């Protein structure tokens, strides 16, 4: 069951709280949505990001880009719609030395689903497609590792045995709203990163008390628009998992009063769990946290571009970056 505000009791930022450490020289790593879904956007954005680094904040980097192709049996979280050929996606990530994460967060997988040919082909390709570089995702051989975001232990055990070159991320679709659940997940050596439910984002009293080795594993979901008091988040994710398995299901009907308006970044910023740039620089980085996930796989590329501008781009260069992207005539932003 999803937690409520009273259950989580988050400490509000700025209420007598002092940063324990300086954020100087600390880097925020963003994990961006739409590996397949927004291939065209990243094909236009990444040359600007690498070629004009002065346009962007010096304290941030791209940690990974995550997503799934359309009709992936192992998919979950959001219904994937990415149609770009996997070899093109792998080549783009390799060119820019960025970790690719396959979103395989279906929570309802059974043994018979593990032989799915499409998902196995993706694993075979991306396990071997890492680039060389100096990113935080390097393995001991100087190669940028690719990852798997998952919920199912059954799937994790299968991938570990058949495709041992991946690292694993514990998906936010587990809906870890109890802090004890988060601590138990952080203890698991299988996971390099753990994405807690966004309602733990401001549980600063408990978060700051974590050992440094666990802080390094926490990956915060920054821009969730779901109601803070939602009690049906798990059911919503299970609905997506069933659809990915090919079950004929009606869409989950969100009971939130704001559900009819769809995702709006301006509304997400009002969410009690929202993490903005000031929070990252003044609260999270100084206290030892460096991993931040941006949601948006099911949105339009124009909205995702706004995330890239807000979280990564200096205000005085946002118009210039926007123009660079818009002038790419091959990109359909809507």
Q: Would you name each region that the model predicts?
A:
Residues 5-9, 15:
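Intrinsically disordered, low-complexity polyampholyte segments enriched for Lys and acidic residues
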Residues 14-181, 185, 191-334:
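Active-site pocket-lining/capping segments in soluble small-molecule metabolic enzymes
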């Amino acid at each position: 069951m999803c937690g409520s505000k009273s259950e989580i009791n988050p400490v509000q930022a700025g209420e007598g709280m002092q940063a324990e450490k300086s954020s100087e020289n600390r880097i925020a790593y963003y994990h961006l949505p739409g590996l397949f879904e927004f291939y065209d956007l990243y094909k236009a954005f990444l040359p600007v990001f690498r070629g004009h680094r002065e346009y962007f904040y010096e304290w941030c980097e791209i940690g990974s880009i995550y997503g799934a192709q359309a009709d992936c049996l192992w998919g979950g979280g959001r219904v994937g719609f990415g149609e770009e050929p996997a070899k093109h996606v792998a080549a783009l990530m390799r060119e820019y030395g960025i970790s690719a994460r396959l979103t395989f967060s279906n929570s309802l997988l059974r043994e018979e689903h593990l032989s799915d040919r499409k998902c196995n082909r993706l694993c075979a390709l991306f396990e071997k497609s890492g680039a060389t570089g100096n990113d935080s995702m390097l393995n001991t051989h100087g190669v940028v590792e690719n990852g798997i975001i998952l919920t199912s232990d059954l799937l994790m055990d299968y991938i570990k045995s058949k495709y041992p070159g991946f690292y694993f991320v514990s998906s936010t679709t587990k809906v870890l709203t109890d802090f004890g659940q988060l601590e138990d997940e952080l203890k698991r050596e299988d996971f390099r990163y753990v994405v807690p439910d966004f309602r733990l984002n401001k549980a600063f009293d408990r978060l700051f008390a974590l050992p440094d080795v666990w802080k390094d594993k926490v990956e915060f979901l920054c821009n969730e628009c779901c109601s803070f008091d939602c009690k049906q988040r798990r059911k919503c994710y299970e609905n997506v998992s069933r659809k990915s398995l090919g079950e004929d299901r009606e869409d989950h009907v969100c009971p939130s009063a704001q559900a009819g308006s769809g995702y709006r970044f301006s509304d997400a910023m009002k969410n009690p769990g929202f993490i903005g740039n000031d929070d990252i620089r003044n609260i999270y980085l100084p206290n030892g946290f460096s991993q931040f996930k941006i949601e948006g796989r099911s949105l339009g590329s124009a909205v995702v571009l706004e995330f890239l501008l807000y979280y990564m781009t200096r205000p005085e260069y946002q118009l210039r970056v926007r123009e660079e992207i818009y002038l790419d005539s091959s990109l359909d932003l809507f």
